[in-house]
Amino acid sequence: MKGVWYRGLSSIDGPIVVAKRREGAFYGEITAIRDRFGALRTGRIIDLSQECCLIQVFGSTLGLSLDGACLEFLDVPMQLRVCEGLMGRVFDGLGRPIDGFPEVLSSQLRNVNGYPINPYARVYPRDFIQTGISAIDGMNTLIRGQKLPIFSGNGLAHNRLAAQIIRQAKILGTDEAFVMVFAGMGIKHDVARFFVSSFEETGVLSKVVMFLSLADAPSIERIITPRCALTAAEYLAFEKNKHVLVIFTDMTNYCEALREVSTTRGEVPGRKGYPGYLYSDLAELYERAGRVKGSSGSVTQIPILTMPNDDISHPIPDLTGYITEGQIVLQRDLSQRGLYPPIGCLPSLSRLMKDGIGEGMTRADHHAVSSQLFASYARVQSVRSLASIVGEEELPALDKCYLRFGDLFEQYFLTQDEHEDRSISQTLDIGWSLLSLLPRTELYRIDPKLIDQYLTASCSAVSDQLRKAIEEARTPVADA
């Protein structure tokens, strides 16, 4: 009961305290805990029985004693104050300001647990989001309202890629700008500083809401952080009709926090020690993306997770892939060769891409060019494997042509500067110019009418450097 303090705890075990259950207590209820010195802590009920309740403390339990602690049940779940003044602010994982400015002045409170969008109320995602990154826009397109994760590995450039997407993302053909919500879970101080500095330098910080749960914060805070971020995103999208792009990093740290709390509670572990409800817990977060009837706003999610040991079959990327609508995969071998962004096009996928590209949305040739680039680059991988066995000199002329195509594809299509913002037309023109290296008979996934319409014009639209590289790489077979 709010306003009533109960003295005494039953036990203290790390961040978990056990207290006698009071009438009306409910799962997820926020509590206040005061030690004998008057210092206040906040906690959250994470388990209930007939006699007692299990409370996860937000912060250290040092200084708490069984007899000297007092407990108040606040009769509310975890809530976040929301208003448009959230934009440009930096908060901790629980929604408390850490940027030196005062608390958000708003009487509007929202339950951070939220609810997934009613399927009947959903609007199917169709609007193309231009990120300015060719490997995404051209071959693994991001659609407004989609949830498209980035599967990365420790030490790869996922932070730089996320910052670039936040700087450059726009909806093609409109002046509507994105509002960004960034949630960092278990990230180091230098990573947090990188994102803040990046947004300040490029002038987008005023359109970004940041929630930072750093590596030295309590585990339970990492579990609350994405829920606070999504609550802010839903308010801005569905009540203020803004297009919101939500970036989560790192979802692996979030899942590790879930495992830690689950172990503390004594739950039966599932795969690799993660709780059996990991799938449903992730779905609670990911399914809060989308568009709804009656609102022009949207929530688009890009969760970033680092795959332990670069293992895409690990439970975290495995379950994430079941819930989300594709994935962008960063590959270590591309990074080691100095390519940025090191996006592996072949293992990457956007399941909603087909519904957001084409005539009237991007360009009439988009689907055909993307499909042909996939097929041709897949052939490159086969030829490279063969060349590693028999040697490049023993390959037929057509296979040598594919090798040259693969090298230039990685150098000019996949690779770009982190401040280079390519339009979709530039991306498709680069794709056409690279495909011109191959014999016309090899462009079997493109309608001949599209080849006649776009090939010559696109080749003349690219940079002089790329045109020169293509001319130098041509073989007699490519001209046949």
UniProtKB/Swiss-Prot annotation:
CDD domains referenced in this protein's UniProt entry, alphabetically: ATP-synt_V_A-type_beta_C, ATP-synt_V_A-type_beta_N, V_A-ATPase_B
One Pfam family matching this protein: ATP-synt_ab_N
Keywords from the UniProt entry: ATP synthesis, Hydrogen ion transport, Ion transport, Transport
GO BP term, example: proton motive force-driven plasma membrane ATP synthesis
InterPro entries: ATP-synt_VA_C, ATPase_F1/V1/A1_a/bsu_N, ATPase_F1/V1/A1_a/bsu_nucl-bd, P-loop_NTPase, V-ATPase_su_B/beta
GO molecular function: ATP binding; proton-transporting ATP synthase activity, rotational mechanism; proton-transporting ATPase activity, rotational mechanism
Function in brief: Produces ATP from ADP in the presence of a proton gradient across the membrane. The V-type beta chain is a regulatory subunit.
UniProt record similarity statement: Belongs to the ATPase alpha/beta chains family.
Alphabetized NCBIfam families for the sequence: PRK04196.1
Protein name: V-type ATP synthase beta chain 2
Organism: Treponema pallidum (strain Nichols)
Gene name tied to this protein: atpB2
